[in-house]
Amino acid sequence: TPSNSSAASDVYKRQVLSAIDEVDGPFAVINADDYYGRHAFEAIYNYLSEHEDDDRYRYAMVGYLLKNTVTDNGHVARGICTTNEEGELVNITERTRIEKRDGKIAFTENDGETWENLPEDTLVSMNMWGFTRSILDELKAEFPQFLKKGLTENPMKCEYFLPAVVSNLLEADRATAAVLPSTDKWYGVTYKEDKPVVVEAIRNLKKEGLYPENLWEE
């Protein structure tokens, strides 16, 4: 089932639900402080333009190659995607410690006592989702129950997880989530040492003409 903890998914639900009165069609959800690449946005746009809800909700998620999301400066947490033969999401397995080791990418589940290699082309979720407006109705419907339980059990830290709703819908066979593979490199500042790498990468994208020097120029 979709993981609740990958990247910043813990704040998604309340942010998305707060926009319910402003959203009137399909939309994408991303982490505000990450760079996802041009292809990812094109893939989400094309999918949402070509698909509508029918007997099930038709959602999508961009899957990144693991090698394009890791850092040289430490370990990261990533959601490892499992898909079916149709390329639809089956589940996301959270690996909380993945890092580069001896030229390979590996993860540990026991504080580094043992490591298991992961293929570089493993698809991972970086929390780029595409939804029809139906997800908002689902979020709204579950919110009162979340408040009742969360404010009773953990009023200071309870979080409303977006992937949990997707997971419930997939398990109930009420929705599908197409995994759209992307070869774009994902950039984020997990460690302070990552910042100059990201700055240089964005600068090079501008030099190549992929983006204007000032993104908001008319």
Language-model regions, residue ranges each:
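Single conserved hydrophobic/aromatic residue that forms the stacking wall/gate
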Residues: 1-8, 12
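Active-site nucleotide-sugar/metal-binding loop of Leloir-type enzymes
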Residues: 16-26
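Short beta-strand-to-loop acidic/aromatic patch adjacent to the donor-nucleotide binding site
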Residues: 26-35
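Conserved core of the sugar-phosphate nucleotidyltransferase
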Residues: 38-128, 133
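Conserved active-site beta-strand element of glycosyltransferases/polysaccharide synthases
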Residues: 130, 177-180, 188
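A C-terminal functional module that forms or caps the active site or interfaces directly
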Residues: 139-174
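Terminal low-complexity segments of carbohydrate-biosynthetic enzymes
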Residues: 200, 204-218
